[in-house]
């Protein structure tokens, strides 16, 4: 999960994206493929919040995602950051990702029609992700 709330409302603060985001080494480019487990775990959405986050805020998706992007932009200067948005997520979380990415001017690559097994991309689905990311990058001159 991006936020600290996981499955069965358990505390995932030891393994959430926002806990691990500073452990990526020295990348040239970052693709964040998140929000799926937040959606599946029914993590609370929370309110849009773009500053002054409390620890409690980070247990809800919207403020945690904003905190993550805000922190990563500062922590990884001169690194291209992209968000990969899975298909098949609910409208509220999909719109939340779009809104927060737009706020931070982060490209949101919306994946479509992925082949999946038990909700996870199959080998074919992983190839589709690769193809869609390559196509997005080509169209946007990246």
What is the predicted function of each stretch?
Residues 33-37, 64-98:
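Active-site segments of SGNH/GDSL-like serine hydrolases
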Residues 2-6, 33-37, 84-88, 110-114, ...:
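Active-site-proximal beta-strand/loop segments in catalytic clefts of secreted hydrolases
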Residues 1-55, 120:
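Conserved SGNH/GDSL esterase-like catalytic core that processes O-acyl groups on lipids
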Residues 117-142:
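Histidine-centered active-site loop/cap adjacent to the catalytic His
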Residues 16, 53-67, 71, 92, ...:
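Extracytoplasmic/secreted proteins, especially bacterial periplasmic and envelope-associated proteins
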Residues 34, 69-76, 104-105, 133, ...:
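Sec/Tat-exported extracytoplasmic proteins
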Residues 25-30, 76-81, 104-107:
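Loop/turn elements at helix/coil->beta-strand transitions in domains of secreted/extracellular proteins
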Residues 97-110, 115:
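Von Willebrand factor A/integrin I-like adhesion domains
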């Amino acid at each position: 999960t991006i936020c600290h709330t996981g499955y069965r409302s358990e505390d995932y603060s030891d393994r959430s994206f926002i806990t691990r985001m500073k452990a990526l080494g020295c990348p040239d480019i970052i693709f964040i493929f998140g929000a799926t487990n937040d959606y599946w775990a029914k993590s609370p959405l929370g309110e849009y919040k773009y500053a002054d986050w409390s620890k409690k805020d980070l247990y809800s998706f919207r403020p945690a995602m904003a905190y993550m992007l805000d922190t990563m932009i500062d922590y990884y200067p001169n690194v291209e950051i992209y968000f990969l948005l899975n298909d098949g997520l609910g409208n509220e979380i999909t719109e939340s990702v779009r809104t927060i990415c737009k706020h931070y001017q982060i490209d949101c690559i919306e994946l479509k029609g992925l082949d999946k097994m038990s909700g996870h991309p199959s080998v074919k689905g992983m190839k589709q992700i690769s193809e869609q990311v390559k196509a997005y990058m080509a169209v946007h001159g990246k």
